Amino acid sequence: MIADIKKATEQKMQKSLDALKVDFSKVRSGRPHTGLLDHITVDYYGTPTPIRQLANVTLADARTIGVIPWDKKAFSAIEKAIRDSDMGLNPMTAGEMVRVPMPPLTEERRKDLTKIVRTEAETARIAMRNIRRDANTQLKELLKDKLIAEDEDRRAQDDIQKLTDRYIAEVDKLLQAKEAELMAV
């Protein structure tokens, strides 16, 4: 019973950490990468469609992402979706490709992105603490129903606290790395 609670707790914390990594990958840093456009959906014949399902996304050069639509009719819709995203990008059609030049980040934009990243990290920390609280509540129920002894409960709570500390430290490490990436000129 205790092992199941610990395992479920660790799985939930890992999912929260993975979600944070995905959120961080959506935040634009100075360097372009193909995953930057993954969260953009295109209104394709009235259906919101992820950009990856409509086009091949590549790095054209060190400062440009290239989007090559499979359906030539999707050019304008893809361009509009990228322009309307909150990333401050200005795509251009160039032959068979939509070129998305990555302008250098201004100091003000870097600070805004840092605030966003810190907020996402804090949300992940709160999620970790809520998962810990839920696990401790389950342990208290087992103790109340006399299915485990007090010392087992205390040991399990200590283990869950160590798990929480480990995952929160991982969140802090990811946050530090992302902040350093954002502030690098």
Swiss-Prot record:
Species this protein is from: Nitrosomonas eutropha (strain DSM 101675 / C91 / Nm57)
Name of protein: Ribosome-recycling factor
Any single GO BP term: cytoplasmic translational termination
Keywords: Cytoplasm, Protein biosynthesis
Family indicated by similarity: Belongs to the RRF family.
Listed Gene3D superfamilies: 3.30.1360.40, Ribosome-recycling factor
A GO cellular component entry from the record: cytosol
Pfam families in alphabetical order: RRF
InterPro entries named in the record: Ribosome_recyc_fac (IPR002661), Ribosome_recyc_fac_dom (IPR023584), RRF_sf (IPR036191)
GO molecular function annotation: ribosomal large subunit binding
